[in-house]
Amino acid sequence: MPKPKSTDALTLIGEPTFDRDGLIPAICQDTVDGSVLMLAWQNRQALEQTLATRRAWFWSRSRQELWEKGATSGNVLIVHAARLDCDGDVLLLSVSPAGPVCHTGDLTCWGDDAGPLLTRLARTIESRHDADPSTSYVAGLLHGARDQAARKIGEEATEVLLAVPGSQEQVEEAADVIFHLLVLLARDGVNPLRVLDVLAEREGLPPRALRGDA
């Protein structure tokens, strides 16, 4: 489960503008990859609780009560920053999710297809484990000799270097490098989101929670 790097309360710059019901929409965005995860509502108490605990709290309009995201499922949202839009009537919460955000089990409340490209691509590659290696190129790499999958990365990287600088060919060969790198990671049982963790930490960002289904 992700943990806040600091136990200090968050600070919100500006005064939020609540609607006639005392609510403000709060958009939750993944800190690392920028994907929009969910939208919920906060009243002043939920906002103050979020800032104080660095965990996402919301107001249920149907139940008329406060609720903490992930209190039951364990899929909490650790909040690293809270910002108001230019009009002060919409909140943006930068978060690290501890698992799928939607109650349906999807990565986002708009479905997995709305999730980050890397996650979707990794899932597609992972699904090829069950495919027939004789008819699936990816399955052949996943079940074949490791040297074969590793060699493809070198071959595609060479094509990048040989392509005309700035050309479409160079772009396409670079895409092949990334794709085959993901295949090798999947073959070795490495969640590619761990790569994002490393890059995030190098940028001074909090690492995202790893999703065990990629």
Task: Give the label of every model feature segment.
Residues 1-174, 178-214:
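Flexible "arm" and connector segments at domain edges
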